[in-house]
């Protein structure tokens, strides 16, 4: 009986595809530009607020709300990502993407016009709701607009260029706050987002969808009642409960509440129960109705790609958050110059994202790039963990470039693996899971990195500067501790800071090593990803 049900629910492969006319030439360039701008804005929105928070809290007298300015966005984004993937399978691709962009823009406008802290938090939550479908939609649009051989290059361009926002965000936030107003950290999204929307509206984006003999229906214009019947709202509620509780536990643990407090333990237990019930419910309703079909989530290529992207994001954000701390706290440079010092990593990442994408598109081999990424980024993080106050310019330039080189090699490979493993009309669901893995993995590793850094800094102060108050150094912050530390003890405190930062990059070593392991599960080593199979590592599973 069980085997019969499993066989019945297993999605059938599509034998024929609708013949589509892909976008070419200038129009394709405009599509790539538009979706890259949108993803850039989304990532910028997540990082630009960092340097604006002191001014926001001063104006609204809301120091106690600082954590919510980031977590409100994260909570709504994580909770809605699988639902966003489901919507892309039910509705017209371009207009669904524009709807998510519109919600993101409304949230940005609310943040910019906020008259109190509560209004700003609501705006951040609304922006997160819109952002939940942007990266997924951008990748799906590229998959629809271009033939498979071009997609690795285009995805590499989009992901490589948009990641600049993670580093540029704090710099732009500081510039807007200092020379204009913190409100422009959010208002900047409005004209750029409107430009991207106009470009997309002017271009016809085809639907590359197989015939209807597959389990999931093709994207189409349907009524509200039909949409609601297909959305698996109970599944959404259960998954949202899991996402909200696990995110709050990570956000509050160690700061607002002790890790062993009843609140944090209760959140973890509630998240676990919600996830288990969600899994049983999705299995019960079957592949055709589930928000996350079991046949999608259980695919080896899919869950390995999600885990790859989660650990990849953890390593990336460790570099992005703690290298500026090293440059500003230890090297004593301005925020602007710390951004300049990050350019070697950004440059290597952009170049290799484009180069690897082009080569994958020509050869079809993507697993070797994922494996190389794990190795190279692990080595880079290990080298960065040796940073000291007097580390030479040549060393930190080369170590960063190596890290960017490695990240560029592998950043688009999990998306390609998912697109290969699933039928086109199911790929949006798989990519939405990958985006959740990326968001959740990044959040988890930032929480762990914060704990490791604090522990390493405290240990370093006890070892190198026992006469200095650890509480005073921590309270002064990474750019203010020089004002509270005696000049004769500053060099010892810098060593302590290096120890905290170095220990943090041990996490990046581990995360990158994990990407190497999960890369083996993303497909065959010798595989032409657009269909032709060659002899390689193991046997590839196909839907």
Curated annotation (Swiss-Prot):
GO terms for molecular function: transmembrane transporter activity. The keyword Transmembrane helix applies. Keywords: Membrane, Transmembrane, Transmembrane helix, Transport. Induction: Expression is controlled by the monacolin K cluster transcription regulator mokH. It is found in: Membrane. It is a multi-pass membrane protein. The chain crosses the membrane at residues 30-50, 90-110, 125-145, 153-173, 185-205, 233-253, 261-281, 307-327, 340-360, 364-384, 394-416, 428-448, 509-529. Belongs to the major facilitator superfamily. TCR/Tet family. Efflux pump; part of the gene cluster that mediates the biosynthesis of monakolin K, also known as lovastatin, and which acts as a potent competitive inhibitor of HMG-CoA reductase. This is Efflux pump mokI. It comes from Monascus pilosus (Red mold).
